[in-house]
Protein backbone atom coordinates (compact mmCIF):
# COMPACT_ATOMS: atom_id res chain seq x y z
CA UNK A 1 0.00 0.00 0.00
CA UNK A 2 1.41 3.37 -1.08
CA UNK A 3 1.73 5.93 1.72
CA UNK A 4 2.68 9.25 0.20
CA UNK A 5 -0.73 10.88 0.70
CA UNK A 6 -4.41 10.16 1.40
CA UNK A 7 -7.08 10.55 -1.30
CA UNK A 8 -10.45 12.11 -0.53
CA UNK A 9 -13.04 11.88 -3.29
CA UNK A 10 -15.79 14.49 -3.00
CA UNK A 11 -15.64 17.95 -1.40
CA UNK A 12 -19.07 18.02 0.18
CA UNK A 13 -19.58 18.24 3.93
CA UNK A 14 -18.04 14.83 4.67
CA UNK A 15 -15.16 15.09 2.21
CA UNK A 16 -14.23 18.63 3.22
CA UNK A 17 -14.23 17.64 6.90
CA UNK A 18 -12.17 14.51 6.21
CA UNK A 19 -9.59 16.44 4.16
CA UNK A 20 -9.27 19.08 6.89
CA UNK A 21 -8.82 16.48 9.65
CA UNK A 22 -6.13 14.69 7.64
CA UNK A 23 -4.20 17.83 6.67
CA UNK A 24 -4.22 19.29 10.19
CA UNK A 25 -2.54 16.07 11.35
CA UNK A 26 0.32 16.63 8.91
CA UNK A 27 -0.59 14.20 6.13
CA UNK A 28 -0.79 15.37 2.47
CA UNK A 29 -4.27 15.13 0.91
CA UNK A 30 -5.39 14.88 -2.69
CA UNK A 31 -8.96 16.17 -2.68
CA UNK A 32 -10.89 15.29 -5.84
CA UNK A 33 -14.05 17.21 -6.76
CA UNK A 34 -15.79 16.89 -10.13
CA UNK A 35 -17.93 20.04 -9.78
CA UNK A 36 -16.32 22.70 -11.91
CA UNK A 37 -15.80 20.05 -14.59
CA UNK A 38 -19.08 18.14 -14.30
CA UNK A 39 -22.11 19.32 -12.35
CA UNK A 40 -24.72 17.28 -10.44
CA UNK A 41 -28.47 17.90 -10.86
CA UNK A 42 -28.54 19.16 -7.27
CA UNK A 43 -25.64 21.57 -6.89
CA UNK A 44 -25.51 25.15 -8.13
CA UNK A 45 -21.81 25.98 -7.56
CA UNK A 46 -18.37 24.36 -7.49
CA UNK A 47 -17.75 25.39 -3.86
CA UNK A 48 -17.01 22.93 -1.09
CA UNK A 49 -19.71 21.89 1.40
CA UNK A 50 -22.52 23.48 -0.61
CA UNK A 51 -25.80 23.33 1.32
CA UNK A 52 -28.27 22.26 -1.33
CA UNK A 53 -31.49 22.18 0.69
CA UNK A 54 -31.98 23.92 4.03
CA UNK A 55 -29.47 26.38 5.51
CA UNK A 56 -30.14 25.01 9.00
CA UNK A 57 -27.86 22.68 10.91
CA UNK A 58 -30.77 22.12 13.33
CA UNK A 59 -30.85 22.37 17.11
CA UNK A 60 -28.03 24.07 18.98
CA UNK A 61 -28.61 22.98 22.60
CA UNK A 62 -26.75 19.89 23.85
CA UNK A 63 -30.06 18.59 25.26
CA UNK A 64 -30.86 17.95 21.58
CA UNK A 65 -28.99 15.02 20.00
CA UNK A 66 -27.76 16.97 16.98
CA UNK A 67 -26.74 19.82 19.29
CA UNK A 68 -24.67 17.35 21.30
CA UNK A 69 -23.11 16.00 18.12
CA UNK A 70 -22.13 19.54 17.08
CA UNK A 71 -20.52 20.19 20.47
CA UNK A 72 -18.55 16.95 20.21
CA UNK A 73 -17.40 17.93 16.73
CA UNK A 74 -16.44 21.41 17.93
CA UNK A 75 -14.21 19.80 20.57
CA UNK A 76 -12.61 17.74 17.80
CA UNK A 77 -11.89 20.95 15.82
CA UNK A 78 -14.42 20.40 13.04
CA UNK A 79 -14.04 22.80 10.11
CA UNK A 80 -17.76 22.45 9.35
CA UNK A 81 -18.77 23.56 12.86
CA UNK A 82 -16.17 26.34 12.73
CA UNK A 83 -17.69 27.55 9.44
CA UNK A 84 -21.20 27.40 10.88
CA UNK A 85 -20.25 29.49 13.91
CA UNK A 86 -18.51 32.12 11.77
CA UNK A 87 -21.41 32.43 9.30
CA UNK A 88 -24.31 31.96 11.73
CA UNK A 89 -27.58 33.85 11.13
CA UNK A 90 -30.45 34.36 13.63
CA UNK A 91 -32.67 31.26 13.84
CA UNK A 92 -34.01 30.97 17.38
CA UNK A 93 -32.78 27.76 19.00
CA UNK A 94 -31.32 26.37 15.78
CA UNK A 95 -27.91 26.85 14.18
CA UNK A 96 -28.57 28.34 10.74
CA UNK A 97 -25.94 29.79 8.45
CA UNK A 98 -25.44 32.17 5.57
CA UNK A 99 -25.38 29.59 2.79
CA UNK A 100 -22.81 31.28 0.51
CA UNK A 101 -20.63 32.49 3.36
CA UNK A 102 -20.59 28.99 4.83
CA UNK A 103 -19.41 27.35 1.59
CA UNK A 104 -16.90 30.15 0.98
CA UNK A 105 -15.40 29.64 4.45
CA UNK A 106 -15.04 25.86 4.06
CA UNK A 107 -13.63 26.19 0.52
CA UNK A 108 -11.06 28.73 1.71
CA UNK A 109 -10.03 26.85 4.88
CA UNK A 110 -9.59 23.53 3.12
CA UNK A 111 -8.20 24.52 -0.28
CA UNK A 112 -5.72 27.04 1.18
CA UNK A 113 -4.19 24.47 3.52
CA UNK A 114 -0.60 23.82 2.33
CA UNK A 115 -1.06 20.04 2.56
CA UNK A 116 -4.28 19.93 0.49
CA UNK A 117 -4.07 19.56 -3.29
CA UNK A 118 -7.45 20.16 -4.95
CA UNK A 119 -7.94 18.25 -8.20
CA UNK A 120 -11.00 19.10 -10.30
CA UNK A 121 -11.85 15.90 -12.13
CA UNK A 122 -14.37 13.07 -12.09
CA UNK A 123 -13.12 9.86 -10.49
CA UNK A 124 -14.57 6.80 -12.17
CA UNK A 125 -12.75 3.97 -10.39
CA UNK A 126 -11.76 2.94 -6.86
CA UNK A 127 -8.03 3.18 -6.03
CA UNK A 128 -6.69 -0.20 -4.90
CA UNK A 129 -3.35 0.51 -3.24
CA UNK A 130 -3.79 3.94 -1.62
CA UNK A 131 -5.68 5.06 1.46
CA UNK A 132 -8.84 6.63 0.08
CA UNK A 133 -12.03 8.13 1.50
CA UNK A 134 -15.06 8.02 -0.80
CA UNK A 135 -17.42 10.87 0.14
CA UNK A 136 -19.31 11.52 -3.07
CA UNK A 137 -22.76 12.01 -1.61
CA UNK A 138 -26.28 10.91 -2.52
CA UNK A 139 -25.86 11.91 -6.17
CA UNK A 140 -22.63 10.02 -6.87
CA UNK A 141 -21.83 10.09 -10.60
CA UNK A 142 -23.14 7.10 -12.54
CA UNK A 143 -19.70 5.69 -13.42
CA UNK A 144 -18.36 5.78 -9.88
CA UNK A 145 -21.68 4.53 -8.46
CA UNK A 146 -21.42 1.53 -10.76
CA UNK A 147 -17.87 0.81 -9.54
CA UNK A 148 -19.00 1.05 -5.91
CA UNK A 149 -21.91 -1.22 -6.78
CA UNK A 150 -19.52 -3.77 -8.32
CA UNK A 151 -17.11 -3.53 -5.39
CA UNK A 152 -19.79 -4.00 -2.74
CA UNK A 153 -21.77 -6.67 -4.58
CA UNK A 154 -25.16 -6.69 -6.26
CA UNK A 155 -27.15 -6.11 -3.08
CA UNK A 156 -24.78 -3.69 -1.41
CA UNK A 157 -25.76 -0.34 -2.90
CA UNK A 158 -29.18 1.28 -2.99
CA UNK A 159 -30.29 4.12 -5.20
CA UNK A 160 -33.13 5.56 -3.15
CA UNK A 161 -34.42 5.29 0.35
CA UNK A 162 -37.95 4.72 1.47
CA UNK A 163 -37.89 4.83 5.23
CA UNK A 164 -40.79 4.24 7.58
CA UNK A 165 -41.09 6.38 10.73
CA UNK A 166 -39.29 5.27 13.90
CA UNK A 167 -40.78 5.92 17.32
CA UNK A 168 -39.51 5.88 20.90
CA UNK A 169 -40.73 2.70 22.62
CA UNK A 170 -41.34 4.61 25.84
CA UNK A 171 -44.02 6.70 24.13
CA UNK A 172 -46.20 3.70 23.16
CA UNK A 173 -49.41 3.17 25.15
CA UNK A 174 -49.11 -0.56 25.89
CA UNK A 175 -52.68 -0.71 27.24
CA UNK A 176 -53.94 -0.54 23.64
CA UNK A 177 -51.48 -2.86 21.89
CA UNK A 178 -50.25 -6.45 22.16
CA UNK A 179 -47.17 -8.45 21.20
CA UNK A 180 -47.53 -11.24 18.67
CA UNK A 181 -45.97 -12.54 15.47
CA UNK A 182 -48.25 -13.44 12.56
CA UNK A 183 -49.64 -16.97 13.03
CA UNK A 184 -47.49 -17.13 16.19
CA UNK A 185 -44.43 -17.98 14.12
CA UNK A 186 -41.23 -17.53 16.13
CA UNK A 187 -41.00 -15.11 19.02
CA UNK A 188 -43.64 -12.42 19.60
CA UNK A 189 -41.34 -9.79 18.14
CA UNK A 190 -43.95 -7.36 16.83
CA UNK A 191 -46.06 -4.84 18.69
CA UNK A 192 -49.53 -4.86 17.16
CA UNK A 193 -51.80 -1.81 17.12
CA UNK A 194 -55.34 -3.10 16.37
CA UNK A 195 -57.99 -0.94 14.71
CA UNK A 196 -61.76 -1.19 14.67
CA UNK A 197 -63.57 -0.68 11.35
CA UNK A 198 -64.48 2.86 12.38
CA UNK A 199 -60.88 3.68 13.34
CA UNK A 200 -59.58 2.26 10.06
CA UNK A 201 -62.03 4.30 7.97
CA UNK A 202 -61.06 7.52 9.74
CA UNK A 203 -57.37 6.67 9.35
CA UNK A 204 -57.70 5.97 5.62
CA UNK A 205 -59.56 9.24 5.04
CA UNK A 206 -56.86 11.15 6.95
CA UNK A 207 -54.12 9.52 4.85
CA UNK A 208 -55.85 10.37 1.57
CA UNK A 209 -56.28 14.04 2.49
CA UNK A 210 -52.85 14.52 4.13
CA UNK A 211 -50.37 16.90 2.50
CA UNK A 212 -47.34 15.37 0.77
CA UNK A 213 -43.81 16.77 0.74
CA UNK A 214 -42.73 18.33 -2.58
CA UNK A 215 -40.33 16.40 -4.80
CA UNK A 216 -36.96 17.83 -5.73
CA UNK A 217 -36.43 18.48 -9.43
CA UNK A 218 -33.98 15.57 -9.80
CA UNK A 219 -36.26 12.99 -8.20
CA UNK A 220 -38.66 10.73 -10.03
CA UNK A 221 -41.42 8.94 -8.17
CA UNK A 222 -41.23 6.06 -10.66
CA UNK A 223 -38.24 4.70 -8.71
CA UNK A 224 -40.51 4.14 -5.74
CA UNK A 225 -43.00 1.83 -7.44
CA UNK A 226 -41.42 -1.20 -5.79
CA UNK A 227 -41.92 0.37 -2.38
CA UNK A 228 -45.26 2.17 -2.46
CA UNK A 229 -45.96 4.99 0.01
CA UNK A 230 -48.70 4.19 2.51
CA UNK A 231 -50.71 7.24 1.41
CA UNK A 232 -50.64 5.98 -2.19
CA UNK A 233 -52.00 2.63 -1.02
CA UNK A 234 -54.82 4.44 0.77
CA UNK A 235 -55.73 6.24 -2.47
CA UNK A 236 -55.75 3.06 -4.56
CA UNK A 237 -58.78 1.58 -2.87
CA UNK A 238 -60.51 0.87 0.42
CA UNK A 239 -58.97 -2.58 0.90
CA UNK A 240 -55.48 -2.01 -0.50
CA UNK A 241 -53.92 -1.46 2.94
CA UNK A 242 -55.98 -4.34 4.40
CA UNK A 243 -54.24 -6.71 1.98
CA UNK A 244 -50.91 -4.96 2.53
CA UNK A 245 -49.14 -3.71 5.67
CA UNK A 246 -52.38 -3.50 7.71
CA UNK A 247 -53.68 -7.02 7.07
CA UNK A 248 -55.01 -8.55 10.30
CA UNK A 249 -54.90 -12.27 9.42
CA UNK A 250 -52.94 -14.35 11.89
CA UNK A 251 -52.93 -11.55 14.47
CA UNK A 252 -55.85 -12.52 16.69
CA UNK A 253 -56.42 -10.65 19.92
CA UNK A 254 -54.73 -12.32 22.92
CA UNK A 255 -57.10 -13.59 25.60
CA UNK A 256 -56.06 -10.88 28.05
CA UNK A 257 -56.58 -7.98 25.58
CA UNK A 258 -58.80 -5.32 27.14
CA UNK A 259 -58.60 -2.52 24.56
CA UNK A 260 -61.34 -1.45 22.12
CA UNK A 261 -62.59 -3.99 19.57
CA UNK A 262 -65.48 -4.57 17.13
CA UNK A 263 -67.99 -6.70 19.02
CA UNK A 264 -66.86 -10.24 19.72
CA UNK A 265 -64.57 -10.58 16.71
CA UNK A 266 -61.41 -12.55 17.54
CA UNK A 267 -59.35 -10.70 14.94
CA UNK A 268 -59.04 -6.90 14.57
CA UNK A 269 -60.42 -5.20 11.45
CA UNK A 270 -56.93 -3.88 10.70
CA UNK A 271 -53.52 -3.98 12.39
CA UNK A 272 -50.52 -1.68 12.27
CA UNK A 273 -47.35 -3.55 13.24
CA UNK A 274 -44.30 -2.08 14.96
CA UNK A 275 -40.96 -3.85 14.52
CA UNK A 276 -38.00 -3.55 16.88
CA UNK A 277 -35.39 -1.28 15.28
CA UNK A 278 -32.38 -1.60 17.59
CA UNK A 279 -30.83 -4.19 19.88
CA UNK A 280 -31.95 -2.48 23.09
CA UNK A 281 -35.62 -2.36 21.93
CA UNK A 282 -35.81 1.37 22.65
CA UNK A 283 -36.87 2.11 19.05
CA UNK A 284 -39.61 0.65 16.85
CA UNK A 285 -40.43 1.31 13.20
CA UNK A 286 -43.92 1.26 11.68
CA UNK A 287 -43.81 -1.71 9.32
CA UNK A 288 -44.59 -0.93 5.68
CA UNK A 289 -45.30 2.74 6.35
CA UNK A 290 -42.76 4.33 4.01
CA UNK A 291 -44.25 7.70 3.25
CA UNK A 292 -43.84 10.97 1.40
CA UNK A 293 -46.07 13.00 3.73
CA UNK A 294 -44.85 16.21 5.32
CA UNK A 295 -43.49 15.62 8.80
CA UNK A 296 -46.25 17.54 10.58
CA UNK A 297 -48.82 15.49 8.69
CA UNK A 298 -47.07 12.25 9.64
CA UNK A 299 -47.35 13.15 13.30
CA UNK A 300 -51.02 14.15 12.97
CA UNK A 301 -52.10 11.08 10.99
CA UNK A 302 -49.94 8.39 12.59
CA UNK A 303 -50.93 9.46 16.09
CA UNK A 304 -54.43 8.28 15.12
CA UNK A 305 -53.07 4.71 15.36
CA UNK A 306 -54.26 3.12 18.63
CA UNK A 307 -51.39 3.10 21.13
CA UNK A 308 -49.49 5.83 19.31
CA UNK A 309 -51.59 8.80 20.46
CA UNK A 310 -48.55 10.28 22.21
CA UNK A 311 -45.87 8.73 20.01
CA UNK A 312 -42.51 10.50 19.94
CA UNK A 313 -41.03 10.28 16.45
CA UNK A 314 -37.30 9.65 16.51
CA UNK A 315 -37.24 9.75 12.71
CA UNK A 316 -40.02 10.62 10.30
CA UNK A 317 -40.58 8.64 7.12
CA UNK A 318 -38.81 9.83 3.97
CA UNK A 319 -38.75 8.88 0.31
CA UNK A 320 -36.12 10.41 -1.92
CA UNK A 321 -33.27 9.58 -4.23
CA UNK A 322 -30.27 8.74 -2.10
CA UNK A 323 -27.39 6.46 -3.09
CA UNK A 324 -26.35 4.60 0.04
CA UNK A 325 -24.65 1.39 1.07
CA UNK A 326 -25.61 -1.70 3.02
CA UNK A 327 -23.39 -0.45 5.85
CA UNK A 328 -24.27 -3.19 8.39
CA UNK A 329 -22.64 -5.74 6.08
CA UNK A 330 -20.04 -3.57 4.38
CA UNK A 331 -18.57 -1.10 6.88
CA UNK A 332 -16.73 -1.12 10.18
CA UNK A 333 -17.47 1.47 12.89
CA UNK A 334 -14.34 3.28 11.72
CA UNK A 335 -16.03 3.82 8.30
CA UNK A 336 -13.53 1.40 6.76
CA UNK A 337 -14.64 -1.14 4.20
CA UNK A 338 -14.78 -4.64 5.70
CA UNK A 339 -13.49 -5.90 2.36
CA UNK A 340 -10.53 -3.54 1.91
CA UNK A 341 -9.20 -1.72 4.97
CA UNK A 342 -7.49 1.10 3.05
CA UNK A 343 -10.86 2.15 1.59
CA UNK A 344 -13.11 4.37 3.71
CA UNK A 345 -16.59 5.67 2.96
CA UNK A 346 -18.15 8.79 4.50
CA UNK A 347 -21.20 10.99 4.21
CA UNK A 348 -24.76 10.20 3.23
CA UNK A 349 -23.74 7.20 1.14
CA UNK A 350 -22.95 5.37 4.41
CA UNK A 351 -26.52 5.75 5.64
CA UNK A 352 -26.13 8.78 7.88
CA UNK A 353 -28.82 11.37 7.23
CA UNK A 354 -28.30 15.11 7.59
CA UNK A 355 -25.66 17.80 7.14
CA UNK A 356 -24.11 17.48 10.60
CA UNK A 357 -24.18 13.69 10.55
CA UNK A 358 -22.46 13.64 7.15
CA UNK A 359 -19.72 15.95 8.37
CA UNK A 360 -19.32 13.84 11.52
CA UNK A 361 -18.77 10.71 9.45
CA UNK A 362 -16.09 12.54 7.47
CA UNK A 363 -14.43 13.61 10.69
CA UNK A 364 -14.29 10.03 12.02
CA UNK A 365 -13.14 8.64 8.65
CA UNK A 366 -10.45 11.33 8.38
CA UNK A 367 -9.09 10.62 11.85
CA UNK A 368 -8.98 6.88 11.17
CA UNK A 369 -7.41 7.27 7.73
CA UNK A 370 -4.55 9.10 9.47
CA UNK A 371 -4.30 6.37 12.11
CA UNK A 372 -4.03 3.76 9.35
CA UNK A 373 -1.47 5.88 7.47
CA UNK A 374 0.67 6.10 10.63
CA UNK A 375 0.28 2.38 11.45
CA UNK A 376 -1.58 3.27 14.65
CA UNK A 377 -4.66 1.65 16.15
CA UNK A 378 -7.86 3.05 14.65
CA UNK A 379 -10.36 4.85 16.90
CA UNK A 380 -13.82 3.57 17.78
CA UNK A 381 -15.78 6.32 19.50
CA UNK A 382 -17.94 5.01 22.38
CA UNK A 383 -21.70 4.46 22.03
CA UNK A 384 -22.18 6.86 24.93
CA UNK A 385 -21.30 9.72 22.55
CA UNK A 386 -23.37 11.03 19.66
CA UNK A 387 -20.40 10.74 17.29
CA UNK A 388 -19.91 7.11 18.34
CA UNK A 389 -23.55 6.05 18.42
CA UNK A 390 -24.13 6.94 14.77
CA UNK A 391 -21.45 4.67 13.23
CA UNK A 392 -22.44 1.95 15.70
CA UNK A 393 -26.07 2.15 14.59
CA UNK A 394 -25.39 2.04 10.85
CA UNK A 395 -22.97 -0.88 11.19
CA UNK A 396 -24.95 -2.96 13.71
CA UNK A 397 -28.62 -2.52 12.79
CA UNK A 398 -30.52 -5.28 10.95
CA UNK A 399 -29.29 -5.23 7.36
CA UNK A 400 -32.64 -6.41 5.98
CA UNK A 401 -34.39 -3.29 7.21
CA UNK A 402 -31.53 -0.78 7.13
CA UNK A 403 -32.48 2.79 6.21
CA UNK A 404 -30.54 6.07 6.57
CA UNK A 405 -30.62 7.56 10.07
CA UNK A 406 -30.27 10.93 11.79
CA UNK A 407 -28.54 11.19 15.14
CA UNK A 408 -31.07 10.89 17.98
CA UNK A 409 -30.88 10.13 21.68
CA UNK A 410 -32.68 6.89 20.81
CA UNK A 411 -29.45 5.44 19.37
CA UNK A 412 -27.13 6.72 22.12
CA UNK A 413 -26.47 4.12 24.83
CA UNK A 414 -29.00 4.51 27.63
CA UNK A 415 -28.03 5.74 31.07
CA UNK A 416 -27.52 3.12 33.75
CA UNK A 417 -29.99 2.91 36.61
CA UNK A 418 -33.68 3.82 36.79
CA UNK A 419 -35.01 5.78 33.82
CA UNK A 420 -35.23 9.53 34.49
CA UNK A 421 -38.77 10.54 33.52
CA UNK A 422 -38.08 14.25 32.96
CA UNK A 423 -36.81 14.37 29.39
CA UNK A 424 -34.69 17.52 29.73
CA UNK A 425 -33.00 16.20 32.87
CA UNK A 426 -32.40 12.82 31.21
CA UNK A 427 -30.89 14.33 28.08
CA UNK A 428 -28.73 16.67 30.14
CA UNK A 429 -27.27 13.64 31.94
CA UNK A 430 -26.73 11.84 28.61
CA UNK A 431 -24.93 14.90 27.21
CA UNK A 432 -22.72 15.27 30.31
CA UNK A 433 -21.72 11.61 30.11
CA UNK A 434 -21.05 11.92 26.36
CA UNK A 435 -18.75 14.91 26.74
CA UNK A 436 -16.86 13.22 29.58
CA UNK A 437 -16.42 10.10 27.42
CA UNK A 438 -15.20 12.26 24.55
CA UNK A 439 -12.67 14.05 26.77
CA UNK A 440 -11.30 10.65 27.80
CA UNK A 441 -10.92 9.36 24.24
CA UNK A 442 -9.36 12.63 23.00
CA UNK A 443 -6.72 12.24 25.70
CA UNK A 444 -6.26 8.48 25.31
CA UNK A 445 -5.95 8.49 21.50
CA UNK A 446 -4.17 11.84 21.21
CA UNK A 447 -6.89 13.38 19.05
From Swiss-Prot:
Keyword presence, Methyltransferase: yes
Alphabetized InterPro entries for the sequence: FAD/NAD-bd_sf, MnmG-rel, MnmG-rel_CS, MnmG_N, TrmFO
Record's keyword terms, sorted: Cytoplasm, FAD, Flavoprotein, Methyltransferase, NAD, NADP, Transferase, tRNA processing
Cofactor(s) the record lists: FAD
Biological-process GO terms, alphabetical: tRNA methylation; tRNA wobble uridine modification
Recorded catalytic activity of this chain's protein: uridine(54) in tRNA + (6R)-5,10-methylene-5,6,7,8-tetrahydrofolate + NADH + H(+) = 5-methyluridine(54) in tRNA + (6S)-5,6,7,8-tetrahydrofolate + NAD(+); uridine(54) in tRNA + (6R)-5,10-methylene-5,6,7,8-tetrahydrofolate + NADPH + H(+) = 5-methyluridine(54) in tRNA + (6S)-5,6,7,8-tetrahydrofolate + NADP(+)
One Pfam family named in its UniProt record: GIDA
GO CC terms: cytosol
Molecular function in Gene Ontology: flavin adenine dinucleotide binding; tRNA (uracil(54)-C5)-methyltransferase activity, 5,10-methylenetetrahydrofolate-dependent
Enzyme Commission number(s) of this protein: 2.1.1.74
Superkingdom of source: Bacteria
Subcellular location field: Cytoplasm
Record-listed FAD binding positions: 10-15
PANTHER family, A to Z: GLUCOSE INHIBITED DIVISION PROTEIN A, METHYLENETETRAHYDROFOLATE--TRNA-(URACIL-5-)-METHYLTRANSFERASE TRMFO
HAMAP family found in the cross-reference section: TrmFO
Family to which the UniProt record says this protein belongs: Belongs to the MnmG family. TrmFO subfamily.
Xref: NCBIfam families: gid_trmFO (TIGR00137), PRK05335.1 (NF003739)
Task performed by this protein: Catalyzes the folate-dependent formation of 5-methyl-uridine at position 54 (M-5-U54) in all tRNAs.
Record protein name field: Methylenetetrahydrofolate--tRNA-(uracil-5-)-methyltransferase TrmFO
Gene designation: trmFO
Amino acid sequence: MKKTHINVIGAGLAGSEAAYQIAKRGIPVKLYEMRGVKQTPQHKTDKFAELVCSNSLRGAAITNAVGLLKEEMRRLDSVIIKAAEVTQVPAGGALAVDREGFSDFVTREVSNHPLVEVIREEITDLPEDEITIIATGPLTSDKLAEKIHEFNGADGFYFYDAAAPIIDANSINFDKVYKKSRYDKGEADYINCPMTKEEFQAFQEALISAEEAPLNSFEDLKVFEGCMPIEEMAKRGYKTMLFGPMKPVGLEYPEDYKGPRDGDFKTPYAVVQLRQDNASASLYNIVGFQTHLKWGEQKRVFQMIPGLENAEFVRYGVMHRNSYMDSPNLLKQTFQSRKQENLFFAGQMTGVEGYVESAASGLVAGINAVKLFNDEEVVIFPKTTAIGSLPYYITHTDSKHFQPMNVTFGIVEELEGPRIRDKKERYTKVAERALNSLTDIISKDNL
